[in-house]
């Protein structure tokens, strides 16, 4: 096999792996429903480019119809290349809106020089994006956070916030008006890096604002990358833990009624038997040799029909 052919096979496997990971996430959390208009938040980074690209490919083959509109927030950062995103989006034929809001000046005015601006900037950006989604009539807001982001947030909250809390793949905004989805929740960052190189997305640097990097998040990110190199499977196991929570074996009295425990009571996850070692779920083994057949999912609720986004569009007569 030639080097070129081998690389083509690897690229094809990567594309299929990402498509299945995003499709599984959408299916598991019922992220996309018939008739949805999804606002894809596009920053110009590798993650949001990949998100839009994969959603477009799923849109073309999915058994349901939904719309995509890309939205970028131009925060008037010095040196921001205003022409890059419109040129790219027009070249691929995706409807888009560029929202111009000078949050850069606001943040610089409020915070001291050299301080990390990410937190305040994020809050301002969120409010503007929510408003834009309402103006456009969008039913869902899609963000480009991936599996590594979710785990990093969990450790940040544990180490610095004293909370066992991560970043949900799907949430309702505090005012109840918006559904936010993260279709890349099952996707590895290293796969997104490879995909961005493969697709040659016109990446816009994320440090144009001149803000100091979030040191805490940087330390957590380095820790996760180090673990991934030294202990294969650890990242997958940790993410699996977020999907297999056992409240009766934690210490939150609001999640579980410890005070009401009585003899003879049978717990869903067992009492002392829950300490026995468990096997890691097979779906979190290395995905490089992933089965290309469509992944079946069990309905979460009997009354709700789950649509498999990975299924093909139904054929029409004469097709």
UniProtKB/Swiss-Prot annotation:
Keywords: 4Fe-4S, ATP-binding, Cytoplasm, Iron, Iron-sulfur, Magnesium, Metal-binding, Nucleotide-binding, RNA-binding, Transferase, tRNA processing, tRNA-binding. A motif (PP-loop motif) lies at residues 43-48. It is an enzyme of class 2 (transferase). GO terms for molecular function: 4 iron, 4 sulfur cluster binding; ATP binding; magnesium ion binding; sulfurtransferase activity; tRNA binding. One of its GO terms (cellular component) is cytoplasm. Its EC number is 2.8.1.-. InterPro entries: Rossmann-like_a/b/a_fold, TilS/TtcA_N, tRNA_Cyd_32_2_STrfase, tRNA_thiolation_TtcA_Ctu1. Catalyzes the ATP-dependent 2-thiolation of cytidine in position 32 of tRNA, to form 2-thiocytidine (s(2)C32). The sulfur atoms are provided by the cysteine/cysteine desulfurase (IscS) system. Homodimer. The thiolation reaction likely consists of two steps: a first activation step by ATP to form an adenylated intermediate of the target base of tRNA, and a second nucleophilic substitution step of the sulfur (S) atom supplied by the hydrosulfide attached to the Fe-S cluster. This is tRNA-cytidine(32) 2-sulfurtransferase. It comes from Neisseria gonorrhoeae (strain NCCP11945). The gene is ttcA.
């Amino acid at each position: 096999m030639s080097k070129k052919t081998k690389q083509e096979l690897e690229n094809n496997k990567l594309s299929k792996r990402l498509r299945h990971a995003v499709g599984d996430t959408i299916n598991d959390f019922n992220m996309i429903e018939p008739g949805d208009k999804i606002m894809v938040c596009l920053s110009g980074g590798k993650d949001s480019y990949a998100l839009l690209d994969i959603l477009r490919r799923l849109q073309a083959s999915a058994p349901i119809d939904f719309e995509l509109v890309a939205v970028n927030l131009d925060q008037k950062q010095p040196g921001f290349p205003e022409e890059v995103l419109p040129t790219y989006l027009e070249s691929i034929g995706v409807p888009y809106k560029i929202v111009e809001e000078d949050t850069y000046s606001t943040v610089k005015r409020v915070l001291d020089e050299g301080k990390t601006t990410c937190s305040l900037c994020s809050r301002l950006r969120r409010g503007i994006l929510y408003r834009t989604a309402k103006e456009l009539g969008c039913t869902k807001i899609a963000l480009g956070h991936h599996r590594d982001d979710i785990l990093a947030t969990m450790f940040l909250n544990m180490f610095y916030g004293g909370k066992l809390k991560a970043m949900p793949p799907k949430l309702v905004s505090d005012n109840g008006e918006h559904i936010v989805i993260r279709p890349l929740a099952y996707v590895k960052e290293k796969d997104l890096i490879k995909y961005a190189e493969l697709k040659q997305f016109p990446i816009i640097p994320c440090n144009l604002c001149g803000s100091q990097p979030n040191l805490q998040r940087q330390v957590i990110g380095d820790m996760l990358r180090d673990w991934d190199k030294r202990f294969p499977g650890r990242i997958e196991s940790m993410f699996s833990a977020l999907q297999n929570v056992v409240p009766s074996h934690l210490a939150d009295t609001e999640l579980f009624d410890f005070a009401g425990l009585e003899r003879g009571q049978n717990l869903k996850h067992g009492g002392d038997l829950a300490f026995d070692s468990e096997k890691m779920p097979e779906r979190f083994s290395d995905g490089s040799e992933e089965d290309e057949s469509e992944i079946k999912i069990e309905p979460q609720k009997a009354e709700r029909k789950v649509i498999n986004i990975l299924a093909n569009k139904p054929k029409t007569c004469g097709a």
